């Protein structure tokens, strides 16, 4: 999800390693490059496919476990199957798009990387737009193919489950997104990539597995958002009051979790704050 580090692995030394320079906040030259628009297309298509497969899985599970249609409710894929669908699709799509767009597929991931200066503001905003549009189109395809079941079973929209407070829902989204974005930073750390040649290849695996684990933990609470595009796409296409109740949770929670993960990785684990402070003190001041 970040630029690949190329170098001679045999001569690598922790003392010799230097972090790649941070991306500028604004870089208008990106708008004139085909690679930028190719990355936007990749994010759009990846998010579309992600929502299509996962929401179709959710709708299929609910139809299989509907007592009116299937008295034997053990025929569904269950929560485990839904979690595998979400985690598996992230693994596949990150693997396919990492070399083109970085494989974000999630506005919260993009936001975390923006705070860490891994992407420019222009790219981050355009990625989020592409992701949200892709999510809307993906859910629209599900509704087109499963129109009767889609409305009947809630359109795969996120919502706060009965018995849980708003605070619990927000906390679940913050912690779940923290786990995901923290995993993204760790799996794509350029220093680890320079030291261990297998790390870039295996990065999609822990990222997908993090999504899988978080879904197991939070599906009973919020249906698991941790991806504002996923929540927005389902809410817009389903478009019932229930889908919009507490919808803000699925934006505030993921963005807060991503911000905390970015701060923790950059300024605690990587000691970025200490380096920045040392650099500031070493500069002459007038």
From Swiss-Prot:
Q: What is this protein called?
A: Probable aquaporin PIP2-5
Tell me which domain of life the UniProt entry assigns to the organism this sequence originates from.
Eukaryota
Tell what the record comments on domains. Aquaporins contain two tandem repeats each containing three membrane-spanning domains and a pore-forming loop with the signature motif Asn-Pro-Ala (NPA).
Q: Which GO terms describe its molecular function?
A: water channel activity
What are the protein's UniProt keywords? Acetylation, Cell membrane, Membrane, Methylation, Phosphoprotein, Repeat, Transmembrane, Transmembrane helix, Transport
Q: Which NCBIfam families match?
A: MIP (TIGR00861)
Query: Which Pfam families has this protein been placed in?
Result: MIP
Give the transmembrane region(s). Answer: 39-59, 76-96, 125-145, 166-186, 201-221, 249-269
Motif NPA 1: list the residue ranges. 106-108
Family the entry assigns: Belongs to the MIP/aquaporin (TC 1.A.8) family. PIP (TC 1.A.8.11) subfamily.
Which residue positions does N-acetylmethionine occur at? 1
Residue positions where N6,N6-dimethyllysine is found in the record: 3
GO-annotated biological processes? water transport
Region Disordered, residue ranges: 1-23
The segments annotated as topological domain Extracellular are 60-75, 146-165, 222-248
Amino acid composition bias (Basic and acidic residues), ranges on this chain: 1-18
What organism is this sequence from? Answer: Arabidopsis thaliana (Mouse-ear cress)
